Amino acid sequence: MGIKSLYQIISENAPDAIKAGEIKNQFGRKVAIDAYVKTAQRYRASTDEEQLTNESGETTSHLMGMFYRTLRMVDNGIKPLYVFDGAPPKLKSGELAKRTMRKAEAQEAAEEAKETGTAEDVEKFSRRTVRVTREHNAECKRLLKLMGIPYIDAPTEAEAQCAVLAKEGKVFGAASEDMDTLCFAAPVLLRHLTFSEQRKEPILEIHLDKVLEGLGMEMTQFVDLCILLGCDYLDPIPKVGPNTALKMIRDHGTLEKVVETIESDPKKKYVIPDDWPYLQARDLFFNPDVRPADAPECDFKWTAPDVEGLVRFLVEEKGFSEDRVRNGAARLTKNLKSAQQSRLEGFFKPVAKTEQQKATAKRKAEEKAELAKKKKKEDAKAKRAMGAKPRGAR
């Protein structure tokens, strides 16, 4: 789920934190990728018309997505490192239960749509029933090993592990669609990196330092804002939308002060849920269960693919095209050996500002100009006062 409306807040209040570019612009970079998001994306992109299973009826869409989208990244000079989720924190159990319920409801709706609805209805509800299993993850790990692409298992949250690897300089950034990756202090969040080429979505670089600068916040305030917006650990406070949440943190500075203000309000405009352990949520963001970047498990490297192993697994066991698999292996061998070249940061351009963003920027510029004008007047007044003092006065 990530953080509700966080991208909207950043795009409106810190637009310079977001840069858009093509996948080729990531050339020469090592990137830690949230493997759950990557695996699930392929499922959600699949439709009934695509070949989701082999002749034996086994699901192969997760392997197809992992193989071809990884090839696309390597073709563009990216060195991917996949990070798989471990056990979720206990505080996340509520969100996971909701997801299970939503999938069950979607399954019922999909079955009903098959009887009475359109093909679009069937596809829409079928996508919501996606569930990545341990077997899917195990097969993806086997595939990555044969491809020569490294992966690690996170103790808990994959995005937290991606963030610490980026923070410690082991990789350039963390690739995930979950905005809460920024709450774990990832210096750079890459969105849409693992989308298929057909999606034609630009790769978004979101820089944490620019986010904090644009919002005028320290990291603790930013995390408090994200908790107030609603995250995987806690639901948002009823009736507190993104603009209200932003104003509350700016006005009061901390969640403690926000909670105190809400609870002392005689009108009871907002009501904090009985079970709302925001201190625990904050601690999970600042002290996640992750492997240190210098741990042996994080000493990863990229190797040449096992071509015959790939053929045995993908062709003989899973029914893939041998020509395509061998061609993909050749691309891996060639591109993983490619010498690193200098990067041109000019590849990226700032995201075009919306009318609302332009209006916000104009307002801030006017406020800044007004403050400068006021200060100039005060300085001139002080100077005149000094000049008006009688001679000999001290």
From Swiss-Prot:
Subcellular localization, as worded in the UniProt entry: Nucleus, Nucleolus; Nucleus, Nucleoplasm; Mitochondrion
Function recorded in the entry: Structure-specific nuclease with 5'-flap endonuclease and 5'-3' exonuclease activities involved in DNA replication and repair. During DNA replication, cleaves the 5'-overhanging flap structure that is generated by displacement synthesis when DNA polymerase encounters the 5'-end of a downstream Okazaki fragment. It enters the flap from the 5'-end and then tracks to cleave the flap base, leaving a nick for ligation. Also involved in the long patch base excision repair (LP-BER) pathway, by cleaving within the apurinic/apyrimidinic (AP) site-terminated flap.
A Gene Ontology biological process term: base-excision repair
Disordered: annotated segments: 102-123, 349-394
One Gene Ontology CC term in the entry: mitochondrion
Family label: Belongs to the XPG/RAD2 endonuclease family. FEN1 subfamily.
Designated name of the protein: Flap endonuclease 1
UniProt subunit comment: Interacts with PCNA. Three molecules of FEN1 bind to one PCNA trimer with each molecule binding to one PCNA monomer. PCNA stimulates the nuclease activity without altering cleavage specificity.
Binding-site residues for DNA, renumbered to this chain: 69, 157, 230, 232
Composition skew (Basic residues), residue ranges: 383-394
Pfam family, one: XPG_I
Native organism: Arthroderma otae (strain ATCC MYA-4605 / CBS 113480)
Annotated spans, N-domain: 1-103
Binding residue positions for Mg(2+) 1: 34, 85, 157, 159
PTM field: Phosphorylated. Phosphorylation upon DNA damage induces relocalization to the nuclear plasma.
